[in-house]
């Protein structure tokens, strides 16, 4: 299932690129410095754009018991740029979290940097939408890997990015180049796509992202579905745990038609699920994920050997704003701090 370009193909690709492309990209540390994630991991999204008015990764880990985080988001400095910052902010360069990540690793944790996100995907500052130079996009990805010392990259593709066919192709071409570079340097790189979903599975444009990955020889380790914000009509309460299972099951069927050489078990292991604790962005408040839903999803993930669970986002994992929908800093339901992380954290191992 997980194919990589051979070094011969890599050399051919690099010869076809302009001077100053991948050949000039970041130099990796020893391969021994790159530690793969656990086979099953809970890695909630951490909203970097709340900095500096949010606890650090290390402080959050110490308070919550969480050890793995998905950092949202790396974005182009501005539309048309080929350089990356956290949240397109010049005050948050790529190495902004270096010391914090080192402290987190001392606790036994690690991070997954995530590219894109709704605001970048909507505004054109997702790096593959913004930059038209595939070799430079790949160099950016490689710099993230070497600067942060990570082994998994997450690509959150939604909004306008789902329909940007040129950006989709560039992203997957750059991923393929980066995978070949990582393989040549002994780095166990994993690629994760995070995509919006309905209970019937991925929309056609989400499927197209993955079909492009296959066409461009970009190996995808994980497909992470955003199991929230369905905007289901009506006011009846939606069972969000079962809705997530429905979405994951439907996605499994779709993946079988895209990754045609993979077994059913391998396809389940490709899947990941993101929940949104409490009230999601649908303002009527009938899409509410509670702790029972979270436990339902954990049991399903364990039974099917899914590779990752996460939430949007760890800063929301508290009951500080009961009744409020779509907050960045609280779930909107009555709960203790870290209830969702305590429930989902049992999945790691």
Question: Predicted segments — roles?
Answer:
Residues 313:
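Residues that scaffold, gate, or flank divalent-cation-dependent active/transport sites
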Residues 69, 308-309:
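Noncatalytic modules at the cell exterior or secretory-pathway interfaces
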């Amino acid at each position: 299932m997980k194919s990589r370009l051979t070094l011969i193909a890599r050399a051919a690709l690099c010869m076809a690129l302009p001077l100053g492309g991948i050949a000039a990209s970041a130099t990796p540390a020893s391969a021994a410095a790159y530690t793969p994630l656990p086979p099953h991991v809970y890695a909630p999204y951490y909203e970097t754009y709340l900095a500096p008015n949010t606890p650090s990764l290390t402080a959050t880990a110490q308070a919550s018991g969480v050890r793995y985080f998905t950092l949202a988001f790396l974005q182009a400095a501005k539309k048309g740029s080929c350089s990356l910052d956290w949240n397109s902010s010049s005050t948050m360069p790529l190495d902004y979290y270096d010391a914090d990540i080192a402290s987190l690793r001392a606790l036994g944790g690690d991070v997954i940097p995530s590219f894109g996100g709704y605001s970048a995907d909507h505004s054109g500052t997702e790096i593959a939408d913004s930059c038209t130079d595939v070799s430079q996009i790949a160099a950016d990805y490689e710099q993230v890997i070497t600067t942060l010392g990570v082994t998994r990259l997450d690509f959150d593709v939604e909004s306008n990015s789902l329909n940007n066919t040129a950006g989709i192709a560039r992203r997957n071409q750059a991923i393929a180049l980066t995978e070949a570079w990582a393989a040549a340097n002994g780095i166990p790189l994993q690629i994760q796509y995070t995509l919006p979903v309905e209970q019937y599975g991925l929309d056609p444009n989400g499927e197209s992202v993955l079909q492009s990955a296959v066409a461009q020889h970009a190996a995808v380790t994980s497909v992470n579905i955003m199991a929230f914000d369905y905007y289901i009509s009506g006011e009846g309460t939606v069972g969000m745990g079962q809705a997530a299972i429905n979405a994951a099951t439907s996605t499994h069927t779709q993946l079988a038609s895209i990754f045609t050489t993979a077994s059913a078990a391998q396809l389940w292991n490709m899947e990941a699920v993101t929940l949104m604790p409490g009230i999601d962005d649908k303002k009527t408040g009938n899409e509410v994920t509670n702790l029972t839903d979270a436990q339902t999803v954990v049991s399903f993930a364990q039974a099917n050997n899914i590779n990752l669970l996460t939430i949007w986002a760890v800063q929301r994992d508290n009951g500080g704003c009961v009744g409020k929908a779509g907050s960045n800093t609280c779930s909107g339901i009555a709960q203790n701090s870290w209830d969702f992380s305590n429930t989902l954290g049992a999945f790691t191992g």
